[in-house]
Design a protein with these regions (language model features):
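A long-range scaffold signal marking pre-active-site subdomains of enzyme folds
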Residues: 1-190
Length: 190
């Protein structure tokens, strides 16, 4: 008895909630300030990724380092592991753990996101290369079930972190009318 853990949401109770914005710590905890800080969406435009790739390849061709001033802001604001520009835009830290956050193409394979090194946001699909896997728009957000009491189910928290990428393509067929979602569920209770 008392072992059942649950987090659920109905469509839609205006006052009851089992989920809150933001990542969890490696042991599945968070605080109100973290939830408040992460109550946002991170949007990256595909046209900015294409321009970034062009500028990076031009810098490499000239034998120079890419000037950070030439990196689009949406790439600098992207919540990926090790982003060196994060603190220029936000007053809170990125989590530093093995799960990372937003998926990205890692040009130099160092496992840290740095657009100056040719890195850019991408869609993470297991078994598929990330190098050319970017859409016309990516929206990333993260939420959890441990940020407060479960007022919808009255259940105990699972300590689940959910990282989401919504993405879309501008095309001349039915794909233009679709939005795709990639969910990464991380059980922080183990």
């Amino acid at each position: 008895a008392g072992n059942l853990k649950i987090a659920a949401q109905t469509y839609r109770s205006a006052t009851a909630n089992d989920f809150w914005p933001g990542p969890l710590s490696s042991i599945g905890t968070t605080g109100a300030d973290t939830c408040e800080n992460w109550d946002r969406f991170f949007i990256v435009k595909g046209v900015d990724i294409k321009e970034h790739i062009r500028a990076y390849e031009e810098a490499v061709g000239l034998g120079i380092e890419l000037d950070p001033e030439n990196i689009p802001d949406d790439l600098k604001k992207y919540p990926a592991r090790g982003n060196p520009y994060w603190s220029e835009y936000y007053d809170f830290d990125l989590p530093n753990d093995n799960q990372g956050l937003g998926a990205f193409f890692d040009a130099n394979g160092d496992n840290n996101y740095d657009p100056k090194d040719g890195d850019y946001p991408a869609i993470e699909v297991k078994g598929c290369p990330t190098e050319s896997n970017f859409p016309d728009e990516i929206v990333f957000w993260v939420y959890n079930d441990a940020g407060n009491s479960h007022t919808n189910t009255n259940g105990r928290p699972i300590r689940m972190e959910v990282q989401v990428q919504a993405f879309a393509y501008a095309t001349n067929d039915q794909i233009n009318d679709m939005t795709f979602y990639r969910y990464k569920l991380i059980n922080r209770a183990v």
